[in-house]
Amino acid sequence: ALSTGDYNKAIEETTASIKDNPNNADAYSVRGFATALNGDTTKGIADTKKAYDLDPNNVANYYNMAMVYKLQGQLPESKRWFEKVLEKDPSNTWSVYGIATIYADQGDDTKALDWLEKAIKIDPSVKSVAAEQDHFERFHNNARFKTLVGL
């Protein structure tokens, strides 16, 4: 349900899973991300932190925590969690891309493009995402950006 954008259904399904098994770290993680995407980042943080308490080695939850912090506007904390993903999974495309978007949002153009280039080297499909997302809108006249994404 989460991958199709049906956040309410994802929240319902994971809440049912948690009722069946209160120690289901994956369910807390997914519910936290879905809840944050649905607009309640405070509850989203609480659920992803609970998932971390239950399973501190769940790398997928690190990513979800990074995204929830990003949605909350806590960019340094978000970057820290993307970096934790990369410690365990150095070629995690969307964590590399996530760091690129944070640098873009913070106005550090050189680092944003360096990280974007790394993400594209891992997975060229990143080009089309970067070309369309708001994070990089102001880069559309930047020669290096145009070369990287093929604009």
Can you describe what each PLM-predicted range is?
Residues 3-4, 37-38, 71-72, 105, ...:
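Register position in tetratricopeptide repeats
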Residues 30, 64, 98, 132-133:
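Canonical tetratricopeptide repeat
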